[in-house]
Amino acid sequence: MSENQRLGLSEEEVEAAEVLGVLKQSCRQKSQPSEDVSQADKMPASESSTTPLNILDRVSNKIISNVVTFYDEINTNKRPLKSIGRLLDDDDDEHDDYDYNDDEFFTNKRQKLSRAIAKGKDNLKEYKLNMSIESKKRLVTCLHLLKLANKQLSDKISCLQDLVEKEQVHPLHKQDGNARTTTGAGEDETSSDEDDDDEEFFDASEQVNASEQSIVVKMEVVGTVKKVYSLISKFTANSLPEPARSQVRESLLNLPTNWFDSVHSTSLPHHASFHYANCEEQKVEQQQQQQQQQQQQQLLQQQLLQQQQQKRNKDGDDSASPSSSVTANGKVLILAKESLEMVRNVMGVVDSTLGKAEEWVKQKQEVKEMIRERFLQQQQQYRQQQQKDGNYVKPSQDNVDSKD
């Protein structure tokens, strides 16, 4: 063993000590004797100021002081030995160290980027899972609310059908009253008494209640349609895939056009039958009037003229567009039917989407179960193979021991 190893010194410490010794010797050689120092002290201040120090002396003194401070710091364990090596090495060595540090920096940066990308992928998977769960919940709630809207619209449709039937019954009294008021100038007292008797059976409160009920039903139908629109736009905007979303959008946008077309193409046959019934009743009344009032020919002629005008007006109403024969309640009834059809279409789209999603989840679960079963089978086979290998090796070891 060498002396340095015995003392426990490393090669770097030995080199630093040698450098320090060389620098100290150079400092002693350059230092002036004590006599020169005393003479320099005795010299006047003007002369001392005029003799400047050499530049090399200044630089060497700075280098020596820096090296001494570094050596002291090494002894006190304040700075590692690598600092001295970096200061004393050449420019090439410093360049090599810099490149090495750059490589380490880039490797660390790559590791950080890879970790960030992996973390982002995990977060994206979790976000997709949460989005799928939330979209499923939204679609389920939307389907439940659409079923409630479907039930409400079906109830309103039945109510509107009753109101339309009542409206088709009540106009008979109004038309008969109007016809009789127009022909009242040519009728006698007996016909006026019959009109009074007929008007006594007509109840106006029923008409008022029917009108109020129709207004309430109309408001409820319109409010239900608005709620359905807001509900679909809220729950199915980001939850449905693209083909289903386009189908829902198309069904929503086609509701006004479908309602308009159905209103202008719908003809209520009940009105025509009522018109024919009115004509037959008027003919019977004319025959009775002719039998009773044979003497009043002039009045009968006026009645015939008026009846012809009424027939012309009624024929014109029948030949007019079918939308003129549709009442307000009939239009609301058509709106409710079209809205009900739209709701059913949206329900079908949402239900089919949920069914496809459930089938996809089942397929994924089946694939995972298959992979898990295969993995377990492979593990069992591997363990059995290990057991066979171990049973085969053990007898050989026993035989070797017995031979020994």
UniProtKB/Swiss-Prot annotation:
The modification Phosphoserine is found at residue 10. InterPro entries: TF_Opi1_Ccg-8 (IPR013927). Residues 26-37, 394-404 have a biased composition (Polar residues). Residues 186-201 have a biased composition (Acidic residues). Present with 1281 molecules/cell in log phase SD medium. Interacts with SCS2. This is Transcriptional repressor OPI1.
